[in-house]
A protein has these predicted regions:
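Substrate-binding/access-modulating region of protease and related hydrolase catalytic domains
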Residues: 172, 179, 239-242, 256-350, ...
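Subtilisin-like serine protease catalytic core
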Residues: 159, 169-269, 283-286, 299-300, ...
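C-terminal subdomain of the subtilisin-like protease fold in secreted/lumenal serine endopeptidases
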Residues: 160, 283-289, 422-477, 482, ...
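Surface-exposed, proline-anchored Ser/Thr-rich loop/turn motifs
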Residues: 468-493, 503-510, 533, 552-556
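Protease zymogen maturation seam
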Residues: 112-182, 194-198
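Inhibitory N-terminal propeptides of secreted protease zymogens
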Residues: 19-142
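C-terminal tail/sorting-segment detector
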Residues: 512, 529, 533-556
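Extracellular S/T/G-rich loop segment that most often corresponds to the catalytic His/Ser-adjacent loop
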Residues: 187, 349-422, 426, 459
Length: 556
C-alpha cells in the first residue's frame, strides 16, 4: 500500500530555521539527568507483560527505556508557547506543535528552544495542519466489490485460498485462532469499522482492547481519516456468518494505533510510528502489523535515497529494530514499488530483526508490484511472502471487496503468527523469525523478490512443537486454482507419489487413483468438473505417508 508513506531522518540535520512555515518540530535532548524515573522501579513505565517479555528474552532495562525528563519537556513548552505532540524515550526527544504561531513568533520560539542548555538540535518534521492538502498515496489497487450472496461450505468464504496458502485453516482446525495473543496495528484509520457486522465478534467479546490516535492526540478519532486500517484489520479478525468470511486470527486481541495522516506525507508520521512502537513495548504486545512505508514526502527535502534503506537512517526503522529487541515480533509491508524507478523496499521494512513481507498472487507467483530487496547494506529483503494480489476482505454493508498490495499480505502473516503464538506461547520473537523463514518454500535459496518464500505455518508448528506429530519428509507444496470449477493442479515436494484420493468433508471417499509405479514427478493435474459444489479433501499418498489439503469446488 502506498500507504507506504515515507519519512526520513537524515544523518545530516537541517536547521529548524531553514523552513519558516509553522508546524511540528522534533527536539533532541542531550541527557536524562534529573529524571524522576528509575531503573530500580521499571513498573512505573513498563507493564507486567512488558517486564515478562524482557525476562523471556534476557533483555536488560537500560537508560534508553527511561521516559524523557518531564522537566525538559515543560521547559520547551514554556519557552515556545507550543503544545506537546509526542515524546520519545528511545530517542530522548519530543515533538512540539508550533502550528498556531505566526512566522515572526515562530522564529523567536525556535531560538528560545535552541538556547535551552539540554537541547541538542531542533528539526522541522511537518508543515502546519492547514497546509496539509496533498492527497494520500495509497499502495493498493482500487477496491472492487464482489457480489457474493451464497454461503460457503467452509467458514472462510473467499478468504480460503489466501489463508490456505499459509496453512492457516489447519491451525484453526487444531484450535489455534490467536486466542490470548495481543496484536498491535499501526495504520491510517478505521473508517466505517463501527458500522460493519464483520467486527461484531471483536467488539462483543471485548477483544478490541485499545485505540489510540497519534496523529491528533488532542482531538482523537481513529474511526475517521481513512479506511485502510479497516481493511488490514478485517484480513486478520473479520467474521461474517454463513461461511461468508473468516480472518486469519479471529480470536486475538487487537490494539489500533493511528499513526498516519490521510491527507499528507511528512516525517511527523515517523514520530507517530515511534510513539506507537514505544507504547506497544510498554504494553508488552506480542506482534505488531505495520502496512505502511516511508521513502518520499510532500516536502522533497525530506526524501530518502536507496542508500538510506539500511535500517539505521529512518527513525521508524530504528524504532522497529528496538521494538523487536524488546521481544515484540514486528511485521512490516515491503512496499508496492516493484514496477517503479524506486523498486526497492521502504522504511521501516529495511530494519534489522523484523519480518519484511512481500506479495504473491493466489498461485504463489511473485506479484510484480511487490518491492524488491536487498536493503542497501545487502541484507535479505523481503523476509517471506504470501498472497497480496487480489486478496478478499469484508467492506461496507457486509459485501466482500478485493484489493492488492503488500499492505494485504503483511496482515495475513501477522494473523498466522498470532495463531502460532497461541500454540507455542513464550517463544523468543527472534526464534519465531528463524522458524517461519525455515518453514518457507525458498528457505534454502532465498531471493530478493520473494525472500525465503511462502511459509507453511502448520509445518512450522509441527516441526517445533513437542507433542505434535511430525510431518513426514514431504508436503503438498501448492494446490490451485482454489476454488476451482474444473481443473485442479497439485505441486508436490519430496517422496515419490503412490496415489491420491478425494473425499468429502465427512471423510467419504469419492474418487481415487493409484499408480502401478511410483510417480516421481512433482506435478499432478486432476479433472474435478463432475464434483458437486462444495469442500473436499485431497489426500496425497507417498512412499513415506500421507498429506491432505482442502480445496473448494465452484460451479462453472
Amino acid at each position: 500500500m502506498r500507504i507506504l508513506s515515507f519519512v526520513i531522518l537524515s544523518l545530516i540535520s537541517w536547521a529548524a530555521t531553514a523552513q519558516n512555515a509553522p508546524g511540528f518540530y522534533w527536539v533532541q535532548f542531550s541527557d536524562k539527568n534529573g529524571t524522576p524515573y528509575s531503573l530500580d522501579y521499571p513498573q512505573a513505565f513498563l507493564s507486567e507483560r512488558a517486564l515478562q517479555k524482557r525476562q523471556l528474552i534476557h533483555k536488560e532495562i537500560t537508560e534508553q527505556d527511561l521516559p524523557v525528563n518531564p522537566t525538559y519537556v515543560q521547559a520547551v513548552l514554556d519557552s515556545s508557547g507550543g503544545s506537546l505532540h509526542h515524546t520519545s524515550k528511545w530517542f530522548n526527544s519530543m515533538t512540539v506543535n508550533l502550528s498556531s504561531l505566526d512566522s515572526a513568533t515562530l522564529e523567536l520560539s525556535l531560538a528560545k528552544i535552541n538556547n535551552l542548555p539540554f537541547v541538542v538540535e531542533v528539526k522541522n518534521t511537518a508543515a502546519s495542519n492547514k497546509e496539509l492538502a496533498v492527497e494520500k498515496r495509497m499502495n493498493t489497487d482500487t477496491e472492487t466489490a464482489v457480489d457474493w450472496s451464497e454461503p460457503s461450505s467452509t467458514p472462510y468464504g473467499k478468504a480460503f485460498n489466501q489463508l490456505d496458502l499459509l496453512s492457516i485453516p489447519r491451525l484453526h482446525e487444531a484450535g489455534f485462532k490467536g486466542k490470548g495473543v495481543h496484536v498491535g496495528v499501526f495504520d491510517v484509520g478505521w473508517m466505517f469499522m463501527s458500522a460493519m457486522h464483520a467486527f461484531d465478534a471483536l467488539r462483543e467479546e471485548g477483544r478490541l482492547v485499545m485505540v489510540r490516535d497519534f496523529v491528533n492526540p488532542l482531538q482523537p478519532d481513529v474511526f475517521d481519516g481513512g479506511d485502510h486500517g479497516t481493511t488490514v484489520l478485517a484480513l486478520m479478525t473479520a467474521e461474517l456468518d454463513s461461511g461468508r468470511y473468516l480472518g486469519a486470527a479471529p480470536e486475538a486481541n487487537y490494539y489500533l494505533f493511528q499513526t498516519e495522516n490521510v491527507s499528507s506525507e511528512y516525517r511527523i508520521e515517523e514520530d507517530n510510528w515511534v510513539a506507537a512502537a514505544e507504547l506497544a513495548d510498554s504494553l508488552g504486545l506480542d506482534v505488531i502489523n505495520s502496512s505502511l512505508g516511508y521513502s518520499t514526502f510532500d516536502d522533497s527535502t525530506m526524501n530518502y535515497t536507496y542508500a538510506d534503506m539500511n535500517g539505521h537512517v529512518s527513525r521508524a526503522s530504528q524504532a522497529a529494530q528496538w521494538l523487536s529487541e524488546r521481544g515484540v515480533l514486528v511485521v512490516c509491508s515491503a512496499g508496492n514499488s516493484g514496477t517503479y524507478p524506486w523498486y526497492y523496499i521502504h522504511a521501516p521494512s529495511d530494519a534489522e530483526k523484523i519480518l519484511c513481507i512481500g506479495a504473491t498472487d493466489s498461485l504463489g507467483v511473485d506479484a510484480t508490484f511487490s518491492s524488491h530487496g536487498p536493503s542497501s547494506d545487502g541484507r535479505m529483503k523481503p523476509s517471506i511472502t504470501c498472497q497480496g494480489r487480489r486478496t478478499y476482505y469484508p467492506i461496507q454493508q457486509d459485501a466482500i471487496g478485493r484489493g492488492s498490495g503488500t499492505s494485504f499480505s503483511a496482515p495475513l502473516i501477522t494473523g498466522g503468527m498470532a495463531c502460532a503464538m497461541q500454540a507455542i506461547p513464550n517463544v523468543d520473537n527472534q526464534l519465531w523469525m528463524e522458524w517461519v523463514q525455515a518453514a518457507s518454500t525458498q528457505a534454502d535459496n532465498p531471493d530478493y523478490h520473494m525472500g525465503h518464500g511462502i511459509p507453511d505455518l502448520w509445518w512450522m508448528l509441527q516441526k517445533n512443537t513437542p507433542g505434535l506429530d511430525k510431518l513426514p519428509n514431504f508436503q503438498i507444496q501448492s494446490i490451485y486454482p482454489n476454488p476451482t470449477s474444473s481443473q485442479l493442479n497439485v505441486i508436490t515436494t519430496g517422496a515419490p507419489v503412490l496415489g491420491w484420493q478425494v473425499s468429502d468433508i465427512t471423510g467419504r471417499l469419492l474418487v481415487s487413483c493409484y499408480f502401478d509405479q511410483s510417480w516421481t514427478r512433482n506435478y499432478l493435474q486432476l479433472d474435478v468438473s463432475d464434483l458437486p459444489q462444495g469442500s473436499y479433501h485431497f489426500t496425497l499418498m507417498t512412499t513415506e505417508g500421507k498429506s491432505t489439503s482442502i480445496f473448494l469446488k465452484d460451479l462453472e
